[in-house]
Structure formats: C-alpha cells, structure tokens
Design a protein with these regions (language model features):
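Short, flexible turn/loop "capping" segments at secondary-structure junctions
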Residues: 1-5, 88-90
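Core segments of cupin and vicinal oxygen chelate
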Residues: 5, 14-66
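Conserved structured catalytic cores and adjacent interaction surfaces
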Residues: 11
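Vicinal oxygen chelate
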Residues: 15-20, 32-33, 37, 65-69, ...
Length: 103
C-alpha cells in the first residue's frame, strides 16, 4: 500500500550575500519578513566536514512561506559544508527537509 507523501517542512538555499538574497526574494516572490541569526562556536558545536572536526560560522535567515520554512545560509569563517557547496556548485538549493510520518 502506498505511503502518504511526506510534507516538505524546510527548503535551504546557500547564498553569497544574505542581505542581497533576502531583498531579491522579497522583491521577486514577496517572501519575508526574514528572521536573521548568526551561528558560531560555542553554540554551534560538534560540527564535522568529511569526518573531521571543524569550527565555522554562518549567517542564516528564515521566513515562512505557508507551512514551509525557507532558510537562506551565508557561509562565514572556517571550512563548512555550506562554504564547500558555494565554492563548488554556486548559489542555490542545498537541502530540503521533510516531516517523517510516525507510527
């Protein structure tokens, strides 16, 4: 029997300039207002890149588009999955999160 589709809860986009991206999404799609935050050690901890410990910083911004959280991520200092993504693939979709069904 087919399982019900898992609903999308979050879409994360890696960007070079978070303020320019917030402005562009606001103007083009009406997304906002944005809640901006900075993640850095020590609150950002137990982070790894390719199985090795790493410390990094990032700036994030979130807004709701209906039931979906749209998150923009601007890499900061230190090696991270977000900085690597930006350097190798450029700006764009990084991940989509879904709500898992519970039994």
């Amino acid at each position: 029997m087919p399982q019900e589709p898992m609903p999308i809860s979050q879409i994360a986009i890696v960007v070079k300039d978070i303020h320019a991206a917030m402005d562009a999404y606001q103007k083009a799609l009406g997304w906002g207002p944005w809640n901006v935050y900075e993640h850095k050690p020590p609150s950002l901890h137990h982070t790894e890149l390719h199985g090795e410990p790493t410390d990094y910083t990032m700036i994030g911004a979130e807004t709701h588009v209906g039931p979906i959280v749209v998150e923009l991520i601007q890499p900061g200092e230190g090696p991270s999955i977000y900085k690597e993504w930006l350097e190798t693939k450029g700006e764009g979709l990084h991940h989509i999160a879904c709500m898992a069904h519970t039994q």
